[in-house]
């Protein structure tokens, strides 16, 4: 059974406990490019005065979790997530992209900044309903380039957890978000909304071309 909790506590749904970057490889891409993109996100976070922890998604990518202060609103967290994603993209635009429409990604690693608001994300240690039953598992930053998602399954996780659960120790303390960083993110279009409008525009253009 998979477990996908929300990012906020019950009764405080407008105040998320984390902001999250979901990093996925291009179709058929190796995990090594995900690692490189995750390190871009870490660099962008450091530049913004923030810190995060990373875990495999249990699929092909990773999730970077950034604990945020209790007073943070969903809108503020979403804005900062967009800002960090765009900053990471700018560090290596040949590797990473924030393009929500798959055909626009050009074989690059996708930095998904839409895990905000009422979104859910698979929990650390949750198994996934996939061949081999992989598990979403925390990895120290310094070891990320030495693992693959296939290293963490329902068969290997119990042994890896024998010395204790590492996720809580890897997560930094909750952090306040800079007002300047929030404003930076507010100026960036929401990816899902932008993609929806662009999809409609392209559909209209195709209909026009077909009719001409």
Residue locations for each model-derived region?
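Ordered, soluble secondary-structure elements with a strong preference for glycine-centered loop motifs
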Residues: 31-35, 74-78
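Nucleic-acid 5′ end/cap handling module spanning
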Residues: 32, 55, 68-70
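A conserved hydrophobic secondary-structure block that centers on an alpha-helix together
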Residues: 32-36, 44-47
